[in-house]
């Protein structure tokens, strides 16, 4: 599923961000692959992928639709967090995305960008861990 969503995103971006049959087919294949993996019946997969909110047609496919379905497929997987950071937590990409109610007050209203070093790292390798420490809201180099 993940590979198909990556393919859909690449095909869309290669076409200037415009929907096209290759991107659309990969998007639908990603949805089907994920639903099959989690045990959804063929009839329910067909019903879901036939829903007008999903079956938008090749020319109407957007990056938002691809990333939204990829997020569902990868929920609780670190790659989903990578996509959120790649797209700067955009609620244009993931409509309705907002900071959680009990957001970490140390982040001062900013999204988390990196994980903290584990205690084992700071206790066993404190010189390097403290030298390379960045606040959790500082973007990693790859997302700048």
Where are these regions (language model features)?
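Acidic/polar-rich alpha-helix caps and helix-coil junctions
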Residues: 1-144
């Amino acid at each position: 599923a993940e590979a198909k969503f990556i393919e859909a995103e690449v095909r869309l971006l290669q076409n200037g961000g415009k929907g096209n049959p290759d991107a659309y087919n990969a998007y639908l294949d990603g949805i089907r692959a994920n639903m099959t993996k989690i045990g959804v019946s063929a009839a329910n997969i067909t019903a879901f992928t036939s829903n007008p909110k999903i079956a938008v047609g090749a020319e109407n496919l957007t990056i938002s639709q691809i990333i939204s379905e990829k997020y569902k497929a990868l929920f609780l997987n670190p790659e989903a967090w990578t996509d959120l950071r790649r797209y700067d937590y955009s609620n244009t990409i993931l409509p309705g995305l907002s900071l959680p109610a009990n957001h970490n007050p140390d982040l001062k209203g900013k999204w988390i960008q990196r994980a903290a070093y584990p205690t084992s790292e700071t206790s066993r390798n404190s010189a390097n861990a403290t030298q390379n420490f960045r606040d959790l809201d500082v973007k990693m180099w790859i997302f700048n």
